[in-house]
Amino acid sequence: MRDIVFIERDPYAPIRHCYTVSKILYQGKSPYQEIQVIESPEFGRMLILDGVVQLDEKYEFLYHEYLAHVPLHAHPNPRNVLIIGGGDGGTLREVLKHDIVERAVLVDIDKEVIEVSKKYLPTLSVGFQDPRAIVVNEDGYKYVQDYENEFDVIIVDSTDPVGFAHVLTTEDFFRHVYKALKEDGIFVAQTESIHYHLEMVSNIQQRLKKVFPIVDLYTSVIPIYAGYWWTFSIASKKYPVRTPAREVKVQTKIYDADMHEYAFLPESFYNKIVNGEYKY
């Protein structure tokens, strides 16, 4: 009997990943995208949107812990958090590990992703059961425009910033985010691969610098993502972000106070990336 193999065809990176599939758990289509959940003997369950792997059970913590805990620990009092995207629930789960968080609003345009994750990805979707979680099925770009001085931290956990997610990387969106944040708010977004999307990373950093006084870049190594070396762009109205502002008490697999600082690129290397001086 031949193995079933899933070949990821990421249109935004010149690379192909192949995964052995032991079982196809779900396959369907929402009004916005194709949704699949497969079981891999090496990576556990995997969520695939429009043919691109979004996460795997084995290594998802390398993404969700960094996306959530760096901004939340950089802020001394993050009580109200907005997550745009993240319908799988992984970022919400990590945010709600912080007892100080009183409200976590998750806005994802695709209700089907949330429902599929609740059924097939229980280790990620546990946060939806928390009474502090509020789920809104709307366009995150439009949602954020309705708020001013509302959130302590805003996290964008989107698919690749192209297609309907492209607006979440524009200067216009960043200005709406700035307005929706409180006077000491912090913003973070996943911003793709240093290896294959270097120009995009640099452009997003430049746009953020037009809006926020403090802008920085940190990374994590994520085996299932193109190029492995993944970036997160972070912006702050007030607080420096390279060191935690609070004691790290949350239970994690890898994130801690040391890893928080290690995640940030050396400033000399960071400046080369932002200024477009770093070339392969």
From Swiss-Prot:
Spermidine binds at H64, D88, D157, S158, T159, D160. The active site is at D157 (proton acceptor). Residues 3-237 form the PABS domain. It catalyses: S-adenosyl 3-(methylsulfanyl)propylamine + putrescine = S-methyl-5'-thioadenosine + spermidine + H(+). It is an enzyme of class 2 (transferase). Pfam families: Spermine_synt_N, Spermine_synth. One of its GO terms (cellular component) is cytosol. It is found in: Cytoplasm. Its EC number is 2.5.1.16. Signal peptide: none annotated. Keywords: Cytoplasm, Polyamine biosynthesis, Spermidine biosynthesis, Transferase. GO terms for biological process: spermidine biosynthetic process. Homodimer or homotetramer. Belongs to the spermidine/spermine synthase family. This is Polyamine aminopropyltransferase 1.
